[in-house]
A protein has these predicted regions:
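Short, Lys/Arg-rich flexible segments
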Residues: 147
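Carbohydrate-associated surface elements
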Residues: 15
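C-terminal hydrophobic structural anchor segments
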Residues: 156-187
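Extracytoplasmic/secreted cell-surface and envelope-processing proteins
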Residues: 18-22
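Non-catalytic beta-strand/loop surface segments
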Residues: 1-6, 27, 31-73, 84-136, ...
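Surface-exposed aromatic
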Residues: 192-195
Length: 230
């Protein structure tokens, strides 16, 4: 159903002959036919939800999730910078819950993008006795981020980190081929990995503060608590 030529992408990176590659591919896959399966529309949650899963565990696992932009959304670049600011060890929430208060044994900000929609948020691992306090602090910090925004230095450092990691990750032919393949499958051009840095470079402080206000909405947050009850 899904493994069809209409759904397949072949990406090749390296010192190769186009003529030889075409002849080889024609010989291997000639006659392989099948129907086209279009990308489906993802369902989204646009209202506040609180979910608790009672488990007998030593620690509780908390997630504060928000709707985010997809791969084809122009907001994705500013959100990627936002993610870089908040996910590092120097991030504001990490500082409050790990450095100033030893409340979280694990903490990270995440950003997962699908085709036309994404999800982002905060994961926190903590003691069950601290769940209420961690909830309060996390929500308070989110409100501060939305209200006060970030600094030029935070945005500059986050952009440099993203760009540096990108150039390092694209040093092998295998990585380039994989990027070309996935980008083509998502409806973007195979050379997207070359233009992505330009999009990141254009992100401004105002862009990052704007997407923080747009997406980090506590009234549309999905809160999940997996673990025991105090």
């Amino acid at each position: 159903q899904h493994v069809t030529p209409a759904n397949a992408v072949l990406a090749i990176s390296g010192d190769v002959s186009e003529k030889t590659i075409r002849e080889t591919i024609d010989g291997l896959f000639k006659g392989w036919k099948g129907p086209l399966n279009a990308l489906g529309k993802d369902s989204v949650i646009a209202k506040k939800r609180d979910v608790a899963v009672d488990r007998d565990m030593m620690q509780n696992h908390l997630i504060f999730g928000f709707l985010g932009p997809g791969l084809i959304d122009d907001d994705r670049y500013a959100v990627e910078v936002l993610d870089s600011i908040l996910s590092g060890m120097g991030g504001r929430i990490h500082k409050v819950l790990r450095e100033e208060n030893p409340y979280a044994y694990a903490l990270t900000f995440f950003n997962q993008m699908a085709f036309d929609v994404g999800g982002m948020g905060i994961y926190i691992g903590t003691d069950r006795k601290l769940v209420k306090e961690v909830n309060r602090i996390a929500k308070s910090e989110i409100q501060k981020i939305v209200k006060e925004g970030f600094s030029d230095e935070e945005v500059k450092n986050a952009k440099n980190y993203l760009l540096g990691n990108h150039y390092i990750s694209m040093q092998s032919n295998g990585a380039i081929a994989m990027s070309m393949c996935l980008d083509a499958m998502y409806g973007m051009k195979p050379g997207f990995f070359k233009v992505w840095p330009k999009h990141i470079e254009k992100v401004t402080l105002n862009d990052v503060n704007r997407v923080a206000r747009k997406y980090l909405d506590l009234e549309k947050m999905v809160s999940v608590n997996v673990g025991g009850k105090d």
